[in-house]
């Protein structure tokens, strides 16, 4: 049963790292055109994040209730005493889920700069953006396809920004500027 405690500690460390990464401020190296405040989940998923923002706390609640119910079931049905390590592991897992939810359920600043887009600890250069599309009140920026492990699998990066004409004009002008340089 001690192995579950190690897993819970690893999960807790992972959630702290995720929280720390999402709270990092970017080190901007060029002129800022526009700063956009945006929800982190919307930046990653666009309109689909609206469902996630509502469903995630409910899902975490069900998982916590299931975890506690499982221990009660073990104790009542099988007369199996619940060890202190399993209780500590459950508490650490619950704390980890709360930390992860706090990390992803917040607004962050996205900076449209002269050389690319900065947010959290990430930087996306204008030359790495392949396509721009308007979709459901968002501007979708598609990154260039990257091969994974030299195979036929590709990783397609995309981010979503709130639709605004000024933002759209900045993005299109910068992409054209970087395409002309190449």
From Swiss-Prot:
One of its GO terms (cellular component) is plasma membrane. InterPro entries: DUF986 (IPR009328). It comes from Methanocaldococcus jannaschii (strain ATCC 43067 / DSM 2661 / JAL-1 / JCM 10045 / NBRC 100440) (Methanococcus jannaschii). This is Uncharacterized protein MJ0696. It is a multi-pass membrane protein. The chain crosses the membrane at residues 58-78, 81-101. It comes from the Archaea. Keywords: Cell membrane, Membrane, Transmembrane, Transmembrane helix.
């Amino acid at each position: 049963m001690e192995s579950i405690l190690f897993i819970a500690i690893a999960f807790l460390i992972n959630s702290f790292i995720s929280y720390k990464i999402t709270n990092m401020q970017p080190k901007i190296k060029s002129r800022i055109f526009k700063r956009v405040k945006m929800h982190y989940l919307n930046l990653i998923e666009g309109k689909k994040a609206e469902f996630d923002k509502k469903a995630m706390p409910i899902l975490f609640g069900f998982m916590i209730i299931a975890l506690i119910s499982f221990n009660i079931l073990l104790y009542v049905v099988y007369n199996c005493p619940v060890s202190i390590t399993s209780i500590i592991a459950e508490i650490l897992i619950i704390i980890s889920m709360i930390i992860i939810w706090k990390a992803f359920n917040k607004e962050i600043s996205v900076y449209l700069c002269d050389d690319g887009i900065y947010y959290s600890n990430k930087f996306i250069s204008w030359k790495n953006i392949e396509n721009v599309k308007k979709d459901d009140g968002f501007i979708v920026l598609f990154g260039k396809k990257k091969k994974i492990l030299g195979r036929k699998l590709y990783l397609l990066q995309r981010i979503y920004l709130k639709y605004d004409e000024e933002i759209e004009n900045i993005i299109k002008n910068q992409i054209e500027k970087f395409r002309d340089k190449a």
